[in-house]
């Protein structure tokens, strides 16, 4: 009962209204987290600017491999989806240093997969460079790592790894 009183005072309500107040606070927290994710994704997109000039061609397949620091895994996936739409057909590899850790996401379009691209195998090949591991499906994969210093090498390796995959 004493704990109930303390909890009620903490959230500025009476014990009878505690559950309702907590439900309200939880909903508010969820909405703020969602808004935060959205803003992170938007900030990452703006920080990257127009990256389409960094698109390379590997055996006739477009490859966009870029770094977007400060973006968490969800943000990278969202950003990847947006870039995939812009790219049209090809492979996208995104890397981010976030809270001292590395996040990697790879995505391949249908045409790229028909040519032999496999996001899961691609991410496995480059994740070791950042001291991590990962995997996924042919069209989307992700990995984490502990060595941000390896990001540039991992992105460079994406090109050779993709070259090996393509027919």
Predicted segments — roles?
Residues 1-167:
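Terminal appendage regions of diverse proteins
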């Amino acid at each position: 009962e004493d704990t109930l009183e303390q909890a009620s005072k903490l959230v500025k309500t009476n014990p009878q209204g505690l559950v309702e107040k907590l439900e309200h606070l939880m909903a508010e927290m969820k909405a703020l987290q969602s808004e935060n994710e959205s803003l992170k994704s938007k900030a990452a997109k703006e920080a990257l600017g127009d990256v389409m000039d960094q698109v390379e061609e590997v055996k006739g397949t477009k490859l966009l491999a870029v770094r977007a620091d400060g973006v968490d895994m969800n943000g990278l996936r969202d950003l990847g989806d947006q870039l995939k739409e812009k790219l049209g057909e090809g492979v996208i590899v995104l890397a981010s240093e976030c809270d001292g850790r590395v996040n990697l996401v790879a995505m391949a379009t249908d045409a790229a997969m028909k040519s032999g691209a496999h996001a899961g195998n691609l991410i496995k090949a480059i994740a070791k460079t950042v001291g991590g591991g990962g995997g996924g499906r042919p069209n989307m994969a992700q990995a984490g790592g502990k060595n941000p210093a390896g990001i540039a090498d991992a992105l460079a390796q994406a090109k050779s790894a993709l070259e090996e995959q393509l027919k």
